[in-house]
Amino acid sequence: MKKILLIGLLVYFASQVNAQEYLFEFGTIRGLDALVTSESPEEVPIKWFDVNTGKDTWYFEGDDLVCKGLPIGVIRSEKQYQNFIMHIEWKHMEAGGNSGTFVWSSAVPGENRLPDGVEVQMLELDWVNQNKKDGVLPPIAYVHGELFGVGGVETIPDNPRGTRSKSIENRCLGKGEWNTYVVVCVDGVIKLSVNGKFVNGISQSTQRKGYICLESEGAPIHFRNLRITELPFGVVTDEQIAPLLN
C-alpha cells in the first residue's frame, strides 16, 4: 500500500512539472556592468512559466502584475539564478493577505502545492490579528519580511525565530500601500532590505542556485518594477543546484 501511495505521489509531482507552460513576460534582467558604467543598461524581459496555478490566476493592470491568490501555487522564472540582486515592489489588497517569493527554488511543488527554496515572506500587517493561537498574537516580525528555507532547504538565520529569520525592524506598510524589497543573494547568503533599510538575512543555504518563483497563496496581491541584476558566479556543488526543468 505504501509503495502504491509513493508511486502515486511521484506521478502527481511529475505531472505538475510537465504541466509548466509559458505565461507572459514580467520584469527585466540586466548585468552587473549596468551598475558601474554610464551606458544605458541592456535589459532583457523575464519570461514566466506556470507551475501549478492557472492562466486565470494572473493578469495585468497597466504595469502591475496582479495575482488573484487562488489556486495556491507558484509561477517560475524561465532560467535559474545563482548570485543576483532582486528589486521587487508589492502591495496586498486584503487585510491579512499572504504571499511571497521563492529564490534558489526547484519550482517543483510539494504536498502543500509550494516548492522548495528560500521564501521571502510577504504578509499584510493584519495577518497577526487573524492568526491568534489561544488568544495570543504571533510575533509582529512575521509580517515584516521573514526569511526561511522550505521543502528541505536549510539556512542559518541572522535573527533567529526557530529556524526562520525575523526582521529586526518593523518596516512593511499595510493593504493598498506599496512595499519595496531588495533581495541580495550571494553564495548561500541572503540580505533583505525592506522599504530602504536592510533588516534581515540568512546564510549557509543548502541550495544556492535555482528558479525564482512568485507565490499565489489565497489573497490578491500586486507586483511591479521587478528588476534582477545578475552578479558573478560563485563556487557551488551539484548538490547545491536545483534540478533543471525542461
Task: Enumerate the language-model features and the residues they cover.
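Sec-dependent N-terminal signal peptides
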Residues: 4-13
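Sec/Tat signal peptide C-region and signal peptidase I cleavage site
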Residues: 13-19
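Carbohydrate-interacting regions of secretory-pathway proteins
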Residues: 20-246
